[in-house]
């Protein structure tokens, strides 16, 4: 009995105590997720207010119990101890005081029921609070993940121009339908109207993206508000009411015992009285357990219902929002595709009626028609979106309807020749005509109206009545042949500019020049001024048409002189398959805003932010060796010279307004060299200008030749075609008229570019290859305008041709190593591409991730997504001071005392850091822009990539910082004292190897800051990778030229040559910056 009493009384007083073990298991079992702070606090407040224990029965029971003195102010522990004393005195006999004390214990049990239930409810509330907060936090996490995915999708819509991307896959298909002047017209119109459509459609995309972001913000707010509202509604009904039935019964029994004097009746033994009290306590215990169990059961039900409600709210809101955004994104792609198709179809149909040279009489109507078509389509899509909230793409036929009609003969016709355009169209048309985004004044051949060209137009009006070679554009008129066009422009240009060596482009207004100069100055701050662009000109008519069609060879010497004045980097003229003429020269900073650079191409949309470029033109080969001599005759007529300038400028123009190329060069990315424009000409007397470019990026074969041949991957990544002399005549003429500089103004070093896949420029193999490969290397070394003395004139070129031994070409393909076939590169290119500076220089960490969103011109943004994993490189740069330039003694330069100091040596070596990566293969570094459209951003690849980059930099941060901080001075001193450059005298044979070998004559170790050691992983890799193959750089093939270049000092007879850093302020020092994490 005693044990029963002890157990019962003790259990009653500890029932309300929470279990610590249970709490720990709950915390271990639950993952810790948290919703937004407002939601979390609201959940706590709701449960605190709703889950209160109703103890109203106390007001009914306690007053009467107190009247009988059945409540005592003692604590439960005191009562327990008195119960113990009572049990020990049970056999001592009846006692009124003892029975009263026992009865009071029952009253105090009743009193403790409320507190016990409240404590149990408090624990249940805490568990429920944790559960609901965790559930809401998990849903919030899921919502955030979906939001990030949607934002990524929206970012891709903005960063990759949809319309340009969608239309690019159709450009080559449509181009194949055309040939001759129809293809010219297509190539002239397509980039302009596509970019106009891109700008129009880009506004719609931005609006969709902005409103989609608003939807995501609304989703967050709505979810949070609905969570709080739902929980309030649910738990407002979840109040806790004590089951007072048994409590009332026990209290009544206790009162009855007091009324009946059982406590003071001596006839009732202590044992009997204790039995009655224990029965009452048992009933109180059962009552307490029932109350708590029922409450827990109810709360679990409410909790489950609340979780279901929150999940339903999440699903309803997310489904509605994300489904809408997904549908709109998908439909935007379809809409862009249809608009692109409509524009291309319209241009193709109109190409039967117009040509780009003879669009002038009806160009106004044509352009307004096209612009109206594009604008109307975008406005219609936007109107539907405003009404329904969804994008409904128009079909391409709907877009074309009402503007372009097709008759039975499949010829095009502009329906409305009396168009009354809106004011907005007129404003856009003005921008289209003058200097802006879609300027058509891009070449000498295109005849356009302009205020600055009145005299020229008057001349044309006078010539038109008598010159039958200028037909009026009409559906029924045949397009003029290329020969006629050539003759026309020979006459026109010759009469317009009889005494001007470098004519301005007709139609190029002063405002345009100012605009472009300003754009270029701004672009210098963020754009690397060097790249190598390749424009392919394929003559499908055969070699016989060379003289009468292109006139490139006939004016080569004149073209060199003109291009030297405009100062791009180099011009490489490829003659035939794999054979090239190299015209390399350095840009003058003050002349980079010449009209030649400002011109816009007929095949691409361009940007004015590239101070210098290298253009490579795959030109038509000549018939014989005599033709080359004839075409290089300095006595060529002025009209042929101008014709050559026109032809090449027309082909090379238009690389500067390309937003993608500008941004890619800024961040050092490569682009593809594929040639989507292919056509087959039916006329053997016409030359089709085929742009090797992807319409998506509007590029004409961008090469960034900065691969390192001695790194494990360079050979496979970039392998230019081997140049082999023609077997018909081994008496080649090699023109080398320069003093080569190790550091020309082609600052490829400033770019953060990486190796790319081999270029596969599509060239037409001709029946007969030219007799020779003429390598013409020309340098302009001074940054001052007065340094025009370095320009090579025609007589000097002729003299140089004759001065070269004919026997050299027999071993031309046997340069120092079998891998060194870079004959289409200058010495400086070779040094950079082979760049292993033996002094190692100091490393500047350039860790790059090609996942970038970059603003292009005209609000067209570009995004680069890696194909797989990224490779890591360190860039090594050098700084040189007080190195004096002296002109070559062999060059016919008037002033031989020009001196320039070199501030920086921009010879970049991209040293691989992860050479042991199993994915370190060329297929993993392909960033072909057209393929990016099919790629997806894989977060699983991006996240570890960023993590890796951070860890690599942070683990070696002190070493890198010390190297950069302390290594500059030492390296500058060492490199200045050892820097030598070979100027070609008898060593033209070793053009690609000698300079790279003799760039620095002594081998030193990388500067190791005191205390850092040379044991960091990055530094070890640099030492390992940059030292390899240095000893045997020039061991093969030297036997062929032992009589020419047996002693290195023979090649070093000239003074040291470096030059001033171009394109940066004089006080700018890029090497004093600390290592930065991307």
UniProtKB/Swiss-Prot annotation:
Record field: compositional bias (Polar residues): 1-12
Species name: Human herpesvirus 6B (strain Z29)
UniProt protein name: Protein U90
Pfam families with a match to the protein in the record: HHV6-IE
Region (Disordered): 1-28, 464-483, 703-732, 781-818
Disulphides: none
Lineage of the organism: Viruses, Duplodnaviria, Heunggongvirae, Peploviricota, Herviviricetes
Domain of life: Viruses
Coiled coil start-end: none
């Amino acid at each position: 009995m005693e044990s029963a009493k002890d157990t019962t009384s003790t259990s009653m007083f500890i029932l309300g105590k929470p279990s610590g073990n249970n709490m720990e298991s709950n915390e271990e079992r639950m993952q810790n997720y948290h919703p937004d702070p407002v939601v979390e606090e609201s959940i706590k407040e709701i449960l605190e207010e709703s889950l209160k224990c109703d103890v109203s029965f106390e007001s009914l029971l306690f007053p009467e119990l107190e009247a009988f003195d059945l409540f005592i102010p003692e604590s439960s522990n005191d009562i327990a101890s008195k119960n113990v004393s009572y049990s020990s005195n049970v056999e001592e006999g009846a006692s009124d005081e003892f029975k009263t004390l026992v009865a009071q214990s029952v009253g105090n049990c009743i009193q403790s029921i409320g507190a016990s239930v409240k404590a149990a409810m408090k624990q249940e509330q805490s568990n429920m609070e944790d559960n609901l907060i965790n559930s809401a936090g998990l849903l919030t996490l899921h919502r955030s993940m979906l939001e990030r995915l949607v934002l990524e999708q929206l970012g891709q819509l903005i960063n990759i121009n949809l319309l340009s991307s969608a239309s690019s896959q159709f450009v080559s298909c449509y181009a194949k339908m055309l040939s001759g002047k129809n293809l010219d017209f297509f190539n002239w119109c397509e980039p302009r109207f596509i970019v106009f459509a891109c700008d129009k459609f880009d506004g719609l995309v931005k609006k969709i993206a902005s409103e989609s972001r608003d939807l995501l913000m609304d989703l967050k707010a709505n979810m949070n508000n609905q969570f709080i509202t739902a929980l309030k509604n649910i738990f407002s009904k979840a109040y806790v009411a004590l089951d007072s039935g048994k409590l009332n019964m026990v209290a009544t029994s206790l009162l009855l015992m007091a009324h009946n004097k059982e406590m003071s009746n001596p006839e009732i033994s202590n044992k009997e009285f204790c039995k009655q009290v224990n029965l009452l306590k048992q009933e109180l215990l059962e009552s307490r357990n029932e109350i708590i169990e029922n409450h827990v059961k109810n709360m679990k039900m409410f909790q489950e219902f609340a979780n279901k409600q929150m999940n339903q709210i999440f699903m309803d809101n997310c489904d509605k929002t994300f489904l809408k955004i997904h549908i709109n994104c998908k439909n935007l792609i379809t809409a862009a595709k249809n608009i692109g198709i409509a524009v291309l179809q319209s241009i193709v149909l109109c190409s039967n009626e117009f040509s780009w040279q003879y669009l002038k009489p009806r160009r106004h109507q044509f352009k307004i028609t096209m612009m109206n078509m594009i604008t109307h389509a975008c406005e219609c899509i936007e109107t539907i979106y405003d009404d329904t909230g969804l994008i409904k793409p128009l079909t391409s036929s709907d877009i074309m309807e009402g503007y372009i009609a097709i008759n039975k003969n499949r010829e095009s016709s502009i329906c409305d020749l009396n168009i009354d355009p809106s004011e907005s169209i007129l404003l856009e048309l003005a921008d289209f005509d003058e200097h802006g985004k879609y300027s058509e004044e891009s070449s000498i051949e295109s005849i356009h109206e302009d205020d600055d060209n009145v005299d020229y137009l008057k001349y044309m009006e006078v010539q038109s009545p008598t010159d039958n070679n200028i037909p009026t554009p009409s559906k029924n008129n045949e397009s003029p042949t290329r020969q006629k066009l050539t003759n026309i422009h020979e006459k026109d240009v010759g009469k317009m500019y009889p005494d001007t060596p470098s004519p301005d482009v007709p139609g190029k207004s002063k405002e345009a020049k100012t605009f472009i100069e300003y754009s270029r100055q701004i672009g210098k701050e963020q754009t690397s001024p060097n790249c190598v662009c390749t424009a392919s000109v394929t003559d499908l008519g055969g070699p016989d048409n060379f003289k009468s069609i292109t006139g490139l060879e006939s004016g080569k010497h004149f073209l060199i002189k003109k291009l030297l004045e405009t100062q791009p980097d180099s011009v490489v003229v490829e003659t035939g398959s794999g054979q090239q003429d190299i015209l390399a020269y350095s840009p003058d900073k003050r002349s980079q805003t010449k009209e030649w650079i400002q011109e816009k191409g007929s095949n691409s949309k361009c940007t004015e932010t590239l101070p210098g470029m290298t253009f490579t033109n795959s030109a038509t080969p000549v018939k014989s060796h005599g033709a080359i001599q004839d075409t290089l005759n300095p006595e060529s007529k002025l009209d042929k010279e101008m014709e050559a300038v026109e032809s090449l400028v027309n082909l090379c123009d238009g690389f500067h307004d390309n937003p993608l190329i500008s941004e890619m060069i800024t961040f050092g990315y490569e682009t593809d060299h594929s040639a989507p424009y292919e056509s087959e000409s039916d006329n053997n007397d016409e030359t089709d200008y085929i742009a090797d470019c992807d319409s998506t990026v509007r590029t004409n074969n961008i090469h960034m030749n900065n691969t390192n041949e001695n790194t494990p991957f360079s050979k496979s990544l970039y392998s230019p075609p081997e140049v082999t002399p023609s077997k018909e005549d081994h008496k080649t003429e090699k023109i080398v008229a320069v003093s080569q500089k190790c550091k020309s103004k082609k600052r490829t070093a400033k770019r953060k570019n990486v190796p790319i896949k081999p270029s596969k420029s599509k060239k037409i193999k001709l029946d007969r290859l030219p007799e020779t490969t003429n390598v013409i290397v020309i340098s302009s070394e001074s940054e001052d305008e007065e340094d025009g003395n370095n320009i090579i004139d025609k007589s000097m070129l002729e003299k140089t041709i004759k001065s070269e031994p004919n026997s050299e070409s027999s071993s031309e393909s046997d340069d120092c190593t079998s891998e060194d076939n870079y004959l289409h590169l200058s010495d400086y290119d070779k040094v950079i591409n082979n760049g292993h500076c033996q002094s190692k220089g100091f490393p500047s960490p350039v860790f790059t991730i090609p996942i970038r969103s970059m603003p292009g011109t005209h609000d067209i943004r570009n995004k680069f997504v890696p194909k797989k994993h990224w490779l890591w490189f360190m860039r090594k740069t050098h700084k040189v001071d007080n190195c004096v330039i002296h002109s070559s003694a062999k060059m016919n330069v008037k002033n031989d005392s020009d001196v320039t100091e070199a501030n920086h040596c921009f010879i970049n070596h991209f040293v691989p850091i992860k050479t042991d990566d199993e994915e370190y293969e060329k297929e993993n570094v392909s960033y072909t822009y057209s393929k990016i459209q099919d790629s997806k951003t894989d977060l699983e690849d991006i996240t570890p990539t960023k993590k890796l980059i951070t860890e690599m930099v942070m683990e070696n941060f002190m070493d890198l910082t010390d190297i950069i901080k302390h290594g500059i001075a030492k390296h500058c001193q060492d490199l200045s004292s050892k820097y030598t450059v070979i100027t070609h005298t008898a060593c033209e044979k070793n053009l690609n190897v000698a300079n790279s070998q003799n760039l620095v004559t002594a081998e030193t170790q990388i500067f190791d800051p005191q205390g850092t050691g040379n044991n960091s992983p990055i530094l070890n890799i640099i030492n390992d990778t940059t030292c390899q193959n240095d000893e045997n750089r020039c061991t093969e093939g030297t036997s062929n030229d032992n009589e020419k270049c047996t002693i290195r000092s023979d090649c070093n007879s000239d003074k040291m040559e470096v030059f001033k850093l171009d394109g940066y302020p004089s006080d700018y020092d890029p090497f004093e910056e600390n290592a930065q994490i991307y």
